[in-house]
């Protein structure tokens, strides 16, 4: 990162901010051995926010994992702007991950799309809001660990931030995304009986039973698509993510474990989803008398949505149109931290530069124009909250 880029970043240039952030590694250490974590990036962000006059705090939410929160007084409602500091790993990348090269109207590098461009848009808008003109009360919260377990957002939520509405600048191609699916993981363990491969009369094949169960999920998936469609998210889905079983080709396997993922819709209850998995298992058990299996719920994250007619959604659409962005409201397929803000009563939507298709890719990039437009829209939306009630 050269001195000119740093100087431009300090005065709030969105492109320079993006390049400075991409040039500062923040690989989640839970996802790649030797990952640097968020400490250096958090310190850089905190330095900028503090120099712009925000009341800024760095919090260690877990050993060597850091959140940054800056607050700026204004008038009227309180707007929370959020993004995550961490990135996925760099293994397998086909470009230098931290060069932040500009070429073809794009910035290239790990985290450029997911989501350091979004952080830069927040920072650029924040710098402008510190200057003349109306502004709401502002909370800038940049969190750790979204790519793994959302430790940073859970810590932020536990601190009970007092905000009226929130924007999470995940990559949405500058479409407003007020809804996204949740997910639930279930571990299915099938127990068989080990025996020599030449003795089918003695063995019970746990892998066969697991395969029958996974095959039965095809019908379950079709049932999900036959349910009434969500206007933005359409339908839930189900698939098997991992499978482990057996000890040798010549031995009937006595155990097989399958981890299943169900993508859920806003409002679906996890216990009801687990019951659906159990129903399928019970039906299979009736046909296969020697089947023995158990289900265990693992990780669950809720789906979420904000009404399309809310001031948050409509205000962002209006601010976008002021800057020549055609209005677009879409659903987000991935799960993001916005759901946890909605859970604590802060309406949150996703709106940011970049395309989720580029996130985590081997040659990750983001368009320069989208970064600049996003900063413009965030500033306009924030000011409109005060002058027009957005």
Language-model features, listed with the residues they occupy:
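Acidic-glycine-rich active-site phosphate/pyrophosphate-binding loop
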Residues: 89-103, 178-189, 315-318
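Alpha-helical metal-binding/catalytic segments enriched in His/Glu/Asp
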Residues: 81, 101-147, 187-190, 201-221, ...
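Metal-dependent amide/peptide-bond hydrolase catalytic core
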Residues: 2, 178, 187-390
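Acidic/histidine-rich catalytic neighborhood of metal-dependent amide-processing enzymes
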Residues: 115-185, 386, 390
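Acidic/His- and Gly-rich active-site-bordering loop/insert found
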Residues: 2-110, 131-134, 355
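Residue-level signal for inorganic ion chemistry
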Residues: 25, 49, 170, 210, ...
